[in-house]
Each structure stands twice: as structure tokens, then as C-alpha cells.
Amino acid sequence: MLFDTPCIIFAGGKSSRMGEDKALLPFGSYDTLVEFQLYHLSKIFKTVYISCKEKSKFNFEAAFIEDIKTLPLYAPTAGFISVYNHLKSDNFFAISVDTPFITRSIIEKLLHVDKNTHDATIAKVNGLIQPMCGVYHRSLSEKFSQMLQNNSHKLGYLLKNSNTFYVEFEDEKSFFNLNHPHEYQEALALLNS
């Protein structure tokens, strides 16, 4: 079964800790990490978009949502605003390009417990909020615009000050995040194990 909720892969970050664009790193049998994510998430969602600064950096076909050109920043805030402007749906599933081990069961659980009365339904692992893994509702659109105006880009702060429902998970490996070169190498080893 494919979910109707649109999925957004956020791939517009600066990747400064990685030293190169992590979305474009080879991953498994795929030319890029973002293609790996796109392939796997397309088995879960009917519609998958890639949120990015510039779609021209990708040499494959996909549904892209580019950040608003007047926003010269590398923060998810810009991506979220563009997504809200582009989509007509009330909600969407947000996932970061650098978390390739999020499982179908995690996504299903988040989608099943989500309610229209929530502003967001977000994963938590060992008490730590995972703001780039969860469902965001249109009710947060105005708050994202305010954050941008205030040059505030902390998703955790936004979620703590909104009607957010958290879902606790225990499997830390599923939330493994690729920020540094050694984490990329660890992820490749995990993928091949």
C-alpha cells in the first residue's frame, strides 16, 4: 500500500561538516544518496518530492521543489516555506536526505498516529527529537514564515512551541545521520552488513 500523504526529501543543506554535498554522494548501488532515498521512499508514498536549492545539480528526473530564490540561506526553513507554497495538501511527511535507514514501519507508525488536530507528529529516539522525520501540517506555515523573518531556524524550538505529538522509537540505527565523512563510511558499512 502506498500512502497518499506527499513525502518531501530535504536535500538543500550546505553539507559543511561533510565537506561536499552529501545528497550527491554515491550510496549502495545508486549514483547518489538522494536517488537511494527517492527509490526507497517511492515504495512507501505515491508522491515523493525533493526539496533543494537548485535542481540543476541533480542529473536525474524527479519532482523537485526549489527553495525560493530570494532566500540565500541553507536552512530547512526556506525549504519548508517553498513546500507549503508548492503543495495543496494539508500535510506532508518530511525526511532528511541524510537519514537513509528510516524504515517503513517507522514511517507507517508516524502516519497512523498523526491527527489533523496536531501541528506535527515527530519521531523521537532515546528522548531526542528528530525534527526531520515526521508529519508537518499546514497550520505551521505561518510560524515558518515568522521564523524566517526573525532569522530563526531552529526546528526543535518551533516544535516545542506548537501542538506537536511525539512518537518514541528505540532503534537508534534507523535514525543514523550522515553529517561527517566517518559517518558516511559507517553508513556504507551498515548498508553492506
Curated annotation (Swiss-Prot):
Its main location: cytoplasm. InterPro entries: MobA-like_NTP_Trfase, Molybde_CF_guanTrfase, Nucleotide-diphossugar_trans. GTP binds at F10, A11, G12, K22, D67, D98. It is found in: Cytoplasm. Keywords: Cytoplasm, GTP-binding, Magnesium, Metal-binding, Molybdenum cofactor biosynthesis, Nucleotide-binding, Transferase. The keyword Magnesium applies. Its cofactor is Mg(2+). Transfers a GMP moiety from GTP to Mo-molybdopterin (Mo-MPT) cofactor (Moco or molybdenum cofactor) to form Mo-molybdopterin guanine dinucleotide (Mo-MGD) cofactor. Monomer. The N-terminal domain determines nucleotide recognition and specific binding, while the C-terminal domain determines the specific binding to the target protein. This is Molybdenum cofactor guanylyltransferase. The lineage of its organism: Bacteria, Pseudomonadati, Campylobacterota, Epsilonproteobacteria, Campylobacterales.
